[in-house]
Amino acid sequence: MEEQVHGRARRESQGDERFFGPYQILYRASLRNPLPGAQWTGITTRIAERLFEEKMVDAVLTMAPDPNDAWRPVPVLVRSKEGLTNCRGMRMGYAPLLSLIEPAIAQGVERLAVIGIPCQVYALRALERELKLKKLYVIGTPCSDNTTTERFHEFLELLSPAPETITYLEFCADYHVEIRFRDGSKKRIPFLLLPLSKLPSDFFPLTCRTCVDYTNVLSDITVGYMGGEGAQWLIVRNDAGMELLDLLGAEVQLSSPGSAGRRHGPVKGFMENTRRAAGGLPLRSMPNWLRPLVGWLMPKIGPRGLEFARARVEMKAIETVIHLKREEPKRMKSMIPEHVWALTKPYGITRQDDGSTRQDD
């Protein structure tokens, strides 16, 4: 569908397209005046606000928090700039975003912007021609894994004795998770010190563990953080995406994304642990006394910037092959695109592992 949306498929030999999909340009970015309550600086929200200010859309379809649970996503059709304020921030869980499209069209919406994660955007693009909208803008955010809101609350309980006071959580590009609390305090936890081994094996469903579209390749513009080295990361994919970015003008600070470190070692280690976990074996873990030291070293010597983003994309590709081979080998040929095999090949995972013959890892 890349060619249908962008006019061409990714070019394996062009820049980083084999990792991130078709794009015109990559940026490291941040709003000069960050929006209060935003997950990062608020670029996604501000683009949507500017669409209303310039009268370019009739509505924005996005997620808002459930009134009874701030972490639970609820689809909303926003009809004004002011309505976007409540939509800032991150939520965790499943919600039928696209269920509001037909009601929106019935209400007379002809020009629509949608803010969504990859699985939502993929379904949207599949329906796009049938919708017959006069204009559709798609602002995508990356997504690595999702879980139910109930399971996410279980995770929060492992991070704090008072999980109900947590108001913000983000996996940062410096190998830390940042948590913010109701009283304004903050806590940063190195990835290696997270209690991931205490999570149930089905915490992330198979559909997420076998998703190969981390970077939301069918959006007009992807707004994330993985390649931003502490700032936000923009993937401008087509002319519509550039039109959206141009709406910010001098409000946004742009620079070329950096890249440092080497990803092969961390990705290989991830592959070995994923194979063990998929086979029901205990994960190999380092001694507890060594974890703080390695957690301190990783932001300094591990992959950073675009190299970190490349590593995450390769990890998702490897994870997809391993889990499909283990649980749904007959689906491998239809669920694994050609470019994924190119990403896994440097790690010894080739099309010979496509499930035509079932083998144990």
Q: Where are the language model's segments positioned?
A:
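Short cysteine clusters
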Residues: 1, 119, 208-211
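N-terminal extension/subdomain marker
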Residues: 1-46, 50-56, 304-331, 338, ...
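Gly/Ser/Thr-rich loops at beta-strand to alpha-helix junctions
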Residues: 40-43, 67, 114-124, 145-147
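Long, compositionally biased charged/polar accessory segments in the mid-to-C-terminal portions
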Residues: 57-58, 164-355, 361
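Glycine-rich phosphate-binding "P-loop"
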Residues: 72-99
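Active-site glycine-rich loop that binds ribose-phosphate moieties when present
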Residues: 89-103, 144-164
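Short, surface-exposed basic-aromatic patches at helix termini and helix-loop junctions that form
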Residues: 106, 125-137, 156-160
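Short, flexible loop segments at boundaries between secondary-structure elements
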Residues: 137-157, 256-266
